[in-house]
């Protein structure tokens, strides 16, 4: 009986471990700034900090069609690919932009051992509420 319980516990632990390895967790997004732009009626600027744990990634997604995005890496490194561009790794202090209507194919922590953080600044229509829309596969 004890052997069965130990085997069941070991199998459960292996199943959880395998599931975690197969599907890394998604990042955490925190809005740090949200303000209308006074001299651009109908436009706002939103700043978000995106944090990925080791090996974390987000599924392919889009941002609002009105959003121009500037991002700079604050910690670690990010593996990024926007449709029509090659995949690239960005390190601390490096930055990139995403044009309105871009499709974000890859957004991942480039490291399996270190966390990664970036600041993304969106300029977009004030009425846009959802910053990320997953692409249905």
Regions found by a protein language model. Name each.
Residues 20-29:
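Cleaved targeting-peptide boundary
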Residues 57-59, 79, 94-109:
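Histidine-centered metal-chelating micro-motifs
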Residues 4-15:
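Bacterial N-terminal signal peptides
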Residues 86-87, 101-128:
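Ligand-binding loop in jelly-roll beta-barrel domains
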Residues 43, 56-73:
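A short beta-loop-beta micro-motif enriched in histidine and acidic residues
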Residues 65-84, 92-95:
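Glycine- and acidic-residue-biased ligand/ion/polar-headgroup-sensing regions
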Residues 30, 37-42, 51-54, 84-101:
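Short acidic-glycine-tyrosine-enriched beta hairpin
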Residues 127-137:
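Short, low-complexity, Pro/Ser/Thr/Gly-rich segments in the mature regions of secreted, periplasmic
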């Amino acid at each position: 009986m004890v052997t069965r319980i130990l085997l069941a516990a070991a199998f459960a632990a292996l199943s959880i471990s395998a599931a975690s390895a197969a599907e890394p967790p998604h990042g955490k997004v925190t809005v740090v700034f949200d303000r209308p732009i006074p001299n651009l009626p109908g436009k706002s600027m939103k700043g978000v900090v995106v944090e990925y744990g080791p090996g974390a990634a987000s599924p392919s997604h889009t941002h609002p069609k009105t959003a121009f995005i500037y991002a700079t890496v604050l910690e670690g490194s990010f593996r990024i690919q926007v449709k029509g561009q090659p995949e690239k790794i960005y390190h601390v202090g490096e930055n990139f932009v995403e044009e309105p209507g871009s499709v974000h194919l890859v957004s991942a922590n480039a490291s399996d051992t270190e966390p990664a953080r970036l600041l993304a600044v969106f300029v977009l229509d004030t009425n846009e509420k959802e910053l990320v829309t997953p692409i249905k596969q």
